[in-house]
Amino acid sequence: MKTPWKVLLGLLAIAALVTVITVPVVLLTKGNDASTDSRRTYTLADYLKNTFRMKFYNLRWVSDHEYLYKQENNILLFNAEYGNSSIFLENSTFDEFGHSINDYSVSPDRQYILFEYNYVKQWRHSYTASYDIYDLNKRQLITEERIPNNTQWITWSSVGHKLAYVWNNDIYVKNEPNSPSQRITWTGKKDVIYNGITDWVYEEEVFSAYSALWWSPNSTFLAYAQFNDTEVPLIEYSFYSDESLQYPKTVKIPYPKAGAVNPTIKFFVVNISSLSPNINATSQQIVPPGSVLIGDHYLCDVTWVTEERISLQWLRRIQNYSIMDICDYDRSTGRWISSVGRQHIEISTTGWVGRFRPAEPHFTSDGNSFYKIISNEEGYKHICHFQTDKRNCTFITKGAWEVIGIEALTSDYLYYISNEYKGMPGARNLYKIQLNDYTKVTCLSCELNPDRCQYYSVSFSQEAKYYQLRCSGPGLPLYTLHNSNNDKELRVLENNSDLDQVLQDVQMPSKKLDFIHLHGTKFWYQMILPPHFDKSKKYPLLLEVYAGPCSQKADAIFRLNWATYLASTENIIVASFDGRGSGYQGDKIMHAINRRLGTFEVEDQIEATRQFSKMGFVDDKRIAIWGWSYGGYVTSMVLGAGSGVFKCGIAVAPVSKWEYYDSVYTERYMGLPTPEDNLDSYRNSTVMSRAENFKQVEYLLIHGTADDNVHFQQSAQISKALVDAGVDFQSMWYTDEDHGIASSTAHQHIYTHMSHFLKQCFSLL
């Protein structure tokens, strides 16, 4: 039997309060202070070895009432309404396969399964793999006309069991899994022409995906993009591999930096139903509208509306202008026709379009109207209803909060995630709005479990009859299944009760989510507070920063990470702050750093920390800052500001000069590095220009030598500037590690090294 105070501590472990937290009363009761609490802390080893594992429930919808879920290596088919299941594929199938299966994919008609193995990672999303097709009716692998090894991407058709795949940068289609492949494109060339897959910059910054293939709803057509990197400059770096390699390999990637030549883009649609073994496919090109074709441009969204209507969104290189082009198929000519009357322009006068790109449209079933998230007159992202043949739209949501995403659209309701509830930007809840009366809005998640759950995502069945709610915090993750007819909970899928039980025997930190005022505006922060936090004591503080455009660090998500260790074992407060430039609070805040990266977002981190140091429980002689990527840049700019607020800091894989970073990301916020545009802001925002001020702080600079994203060049130039300025600093590189420094040994090493540096800075050794 649990003692009452232990029960409450267990609740604290799963529900770090996401309100203004003072010292929880439970921690002040008899027998519950640091001197008498014999429970263990959450250690660095716990984080590195993932001792305490959160459970997830990753289902895959295969109809409007059924989903697949992998359990004990069996693939089970569940009925959503009743919860009963049957074995869809036995674990013995995997055991007999002879390869280590990385993933699987079931054809829409459930006749075949695609097994993925020999997975080889390339960049953030891209990889190559081998594939075999399993016939579910015959319960055997298909051995004829197999998919080639090192396939770059593969996808089932929307219906039936056709396959489209990319190999050696060209597209192939199989009408039947055991039929010969038909080649769709013939122009593919490594690192030059990409058909059906993205090049580096489109993968990283535009589509956040490797695939550039889109099946039509009934699989009559296959749309694809072609990227031409012929003129794109190459980034080159050494890859050292194992010590037996006498000369390092040289990795070369077409990588457009700010102001450099960009890839060009073409878009095609091919009629798959017209394919025959003796006739090569004819692809019809859809040319962008003239308003973007006149200069450099991007394809940023592809959405099939109906079987014979497709929506494309194009973006100018200066990303404050986008245009949606809705094209119809002309059966008489076999061409796709664009009409000015079906084009929709989106312009930003204060920054850039969308959060990172224009939002995707959600079309009604007849294809004659759509809903899309755009900025309203007040600068908040809300849902607007468009007719396809009219320019103006009607906003169906409003307020000083933002819609995060549209999740489902039926004939009666639109479902969306927003941060409206209680005015907390770092929360997420599911809402539905009645389409025949926009005043009828219901929050489906706000009051379900408000202490434990304030940050939700959702997964809908194919026609939105059922949905899975995924609660990510502030308590332990919780997965539940609901019927959309009445929105009642059908069952709990995973509640992490085992982890809850284990964490009751661990001294866990608590989480504070609150706001301060800067420049007359409310800005949010979070603090991970040590166990038995006592506001009358003084604690060292680590500011964990990202601070990139549209970022958010103060949120209601439960995490077990490095900060958990630092707070639990080392009694360090770990804080994060969302200042100017951060997202989900309106364009006024987000666009404040437009064309001036390295300014306000840096200043606000310093000023927020000054306010933290005045709260009475922060030791102002022991304040540090750390960040990764953009966070490494802001860390370095903060330390180089000479504010006197910070004693030390750690920058991992930082940007140091925006002219070194990729064109799509950088120019979105900074424009072009030319005298006619914004060269002065580029030159005034480098870390190197602040080298002299690093004499006042302790600095640890870390980078992976095979970082394809933020190149080692960035840290090399910081190092050179610091050496030239006579600054004593520490540095660590990780051989052949990319931007994530995620290999098992490197991951353990970097966090051990950073922990030692921080403890030394705070005199905790």
Curated annotation (Swiss-Prot):
Inhibited by GPC3 and diprotin A. It catalyses: Release of an N-terminal dipeptide, Xaa-Yaa-|-Zaa-, from a polypeptide, preferentially when Yaa is Pro, provided Zaa is neither Pro nor hydroxyproline. Its EC number is 3.4.14.5. The soluble form (Dipeptidyl peptidase 4 soluble form also named SDPP) derives from the membrane form (Dipeptidyl peptidase 4 membrane form also named MDPP) by proteolytic processing. The keyword Nucleotide-binding does not apply. Intestinal epithelium, dendritic cells and several immune system tissues. The chain crosses the membrane at residues 7-29. Keywords: Aminopeptidase, Cell adhesion, Cell junction, Cell membrane, Cell projection, Disulfide bond, Glycoprotein, Hydrolase, Membrane, Protease, Receptor, Secreted, Serine protease, Signal-anchor, Transmembrane, Transmembrane helix. The active site is at 629 (charge relay system), 707 (charge relay system), 739 (charge relay system). Residues 1-6 are cytoplasmic. Disulfide bonds join 384-393, 443-446, 453-471, 648-761. GO terms for molecular function: aminopeptidase activity; dipeptidyl-peptidase activity; protease binding; protein homodimerization activity; serine-type endopeptidase activity; signaling receptor binding. PANTHER family: DIPEPTIDYL PEPTIDASE 4, PROTEASE FAMILY S9B,C DIPEPTIDYL-PEPTIDASE IV-RELATED. Cell surface glycoprotein receptor involved in the costimulatory signal essential for T-cell receptor (TCR)-mediated T-cell activation. Acts as a positive regulator of T-cell coactivation, by binding at least ADA, CAV1, IGF2R, and PTPRC. Its binding to CAV1 and CARD11 induces T-cell proliferation and NF-kappa-B activation in a T-cell receptor/CD3-dependent manner. Its interaction with ADA also regulates lymphocyte-epithelial cell adhesion. This is Dipeptidyl peptidase 4. It comes from Bos taurus.
